[in-house]
Amino acid sequence: MARQIKKSGARKTKRNAVNGITHIKSTFNNTIVTITNLKGETLSWSSSGASGFKGAKKGTPFAAQTAAEKAARQAMDQGMRQTEVLVNGPGAGRETAIRALQAAGLEITLIKDITPVPHNGCRPPKKRRV
């Protein structure tokens, strides 16, 4: 019988990045927080869904706050202290996620809104009738 050889796959390496960029994508249904170094390599990420929220609760500001805290904790364990924040999307959790990053202990050096705005491109979804 042949011996099993263990393959050493890609392991998570601890990166020491003091500065980084936090990308917050806030849609109506979910909020995704990704923290990268200055090159754009992901250090940590979290989302409302990954934080345990399901369905309509994923779009709430509290879910965004929980996701931001979780991502910030992981990034700070890898040595991050300062971050720039790039906010994208029209969702409810935008400001709450930024406040949660500050409360977690990250120093925010820049806040930039990079939400794409059409110059009258595609037709938007129809309005809801409740």
Curated annotation (Swiss-Prot):
Cite a single GO MF annotation. rRNA binding
Share an example GO biological-process annotation for this protein: translation
Pfam families, per database record: Ribosomal_S11 (PF00411)
GO cellular component annotations of the record? chloroplast; ribonucleoprotein complex; ribosome
Q: Which Gene3D superfamilies match?
A: Ribosomal protein S11 (3.30.420.80)
Question: Where is the protein found, in the record's own terms?
Answer: Plastid, Chloroplast
Residue ranges the record marks as coiled coil: none
Question: Which InterPro entries does this UniProt record tie to the protein?
Answer: Ribosomal_uS11, Ribosomal_uS11_bac-type, Ribosomal_uS11_CS, Ribosomal_uS11_sf
The secretion signal range is: none
Against PROSITE patterns, the record matches this protein to:
RIBOSOMAL_S11 (PS00054)
Q: Which UniProt keywords apply?
A: Chloroplast, Plastid, Ribonucleoprotein, Ribosomal protein, RNA-binding, rRNA-binding
Keyword Plastid attached: yes
Q: Which PANTHER family match?
A: 40S RIBOSOMAL PROTEIN S14/30S RIBOSOMAL PROTEIN S11
What is the similarity comment for this entry? Belongs to the universal ribosomal protein uS11 family.
The name of this protein is Small ribosomal subunit protein uS11c
Gene name, Swiss-Prot/TrEMBL: rps11
